[in-house]
Amino acid sequence: MQLNEAVSKRLTELLDERNMTQYQLYMKSGVPKSTIGNLVNCTYDSMKLRVLHELCQGLEISLPEFFASPLFEEENLEP
C-alpha cells in the first residue's frame, strides 16, 4: 500500500477507537476539516509534518504512537 493509504487507514482507526468524528478532531486539533477529509479520503499528494503533529495532539497521542502500527512496516508499504 502507498504511504498516504497507510496514513488514511491509521487516522481512521484512531478516530474509530476514540468514537471521534472528523469534526471533533478539527475542533481539538485546529487542522481544517477539509484537510482532515482529504487525509481520510487519500485525496492529497503530500502533507506537512506539522499537520500530522497537530492531528496527534488532537488525538492525544505522540508521533511515534501514530506510526506504531503494522501499516507502516516496510513490507506493507510500496517504495
PLM region descriptions:
Residues N19-N38:
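Short alpha-helical DNA-recognition segment
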Residues D16, G30, N41, L71:
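Residue-level detection of the helix-turn-helix DNA-binding "recognition helix"
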Residues T43-E54:
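Short, basic-rich loop-to-helix N-cap that marks the start of a DNA-contacting helix
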Residues M1-T21:
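A short, Lys/Arg-rich alpha-helix, primarily the initiator
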Residues N38, F67-P79:
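Short, charged recognition helix plus adjacent turn
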Residues L15, Y26, C56:
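The alpha-helix within a helix-turn-helix
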